[in-house]
Amino acid sequence: MSKRDYYQVLGVPRTASEDDLKKAYRRCAMKYHPDRNPGDAAAEAAFKECKEAYEVLADTKKRKLYDTHGHAAFEHGVGGGNAPDMNDIFGDIFGNIFGGARASRRGADVGYMVELDLEEAVAGVERQIQIPTLVECTHCNGSGSEDGHVETCGTCRGSGQVRIQRGIFAMQQTCPHCGGRGVIIRNPCKVCNGAGRVEDHKTLSVKIPAGVDNGDRIRLSGEGEQGPDGVPPGDLYVEVRVREHPIFQRDGDDLHCEVPVRISQAALGDIVRVATLDGEAEIRIPAETQSGKLFRLRGKGVRSVRSRTEGDLYCRIVVETPVNLTAEQRKLLEQFEMTFAGEDARKHSPKSATFLDGVKSFWDRMTS
């Protein structure tokens, strides 16, 4: 399940200040705190989500990483390669016990965040991106040696690992003499300082499929950092972030929008034109339509990136109160309002009548 954007979780814009973040987190925590919602698993999950979002965005360094790389910045192996590889750790300890060879290493995975408009996410798009990465040093051809000469480590005999006997257990660990490289470099390369890799930028063309949503990731195999000593490079993970749209809100493969109509249109009925992502469509509003009524346009949502089925567009009617009335319009409305006097009001406005009856009943009980 894709993680929600941290800014959306807290309900703040990407330009939010520290104070804005703190206030948003307090609101969220008060709303979803387990003590206020005992036994509510959904509230508990929402509380944890808010806490996780605030912990990242309230930390300047973490926020900068998140703004650049998205959720991938905090997942194992993505965005720098400083986290230890658990496969290597367990391979070092248990490799000889179970007879397994040292696991093949590779370069670190890299995370990159790409922002899309809703239209781009729905239709798919190809983007050129430039990413910082580590590539093989061309000066020493990745050897790390200025003169190209390297010596086989005498401690591990080139394997990069040493065998340690502890009681009945035979363990394998990274060679402390060569740091696991298996070689000793006496004359380090002046360009890469013996690392065999240098920092660089590379430009890639990324095809983003139609239907992607916030948090979706695209994996580009072998486009991550170059591994040390010629081992294969890692992968590049491109995480999608979709900008808010002025008209549509997305919910999975469905889209939602509000359609404002005049009082006369809602009362008498009308045909209203609405925007969709592929043009315009018409909604036939029946007479006496109330504000909040939903109309569904089948197949006018988003084509799923996974199942290739299409979602729907839900249009919510909002009856708009007229403003900036002329004297004539005001007079006509006053005359119209007078027609609701007496018992006719209950017939024409049943919800208002029911509400007033409820208020009267409440006060009668309070005063009795």
From Swiss-Prot:
This is Chaperone protein DnaJ. It comes from Xylella fastidiosa (strain M12). InterPro entries: DnaJ (IPR012724), DnaJ_C (IPR002939), DnaJ_domain (IPR001623), HSP40/DnaJ_pept-bd (IPR008971), HSP_DnaJ_Cys-rich_dom (IPR001305), HSP_DnaJ_Cys-rich_dom_sf (IPR036410), J_dom_sf (IPR036869). SMART domains: DnaJ (SM00271). Zn(2+) 1 binds at residues 137, 140, 189, 192. Homodimer. It is found in: Cytoplasm. The gene is dnaJ. Belongs to the DnaJ family.
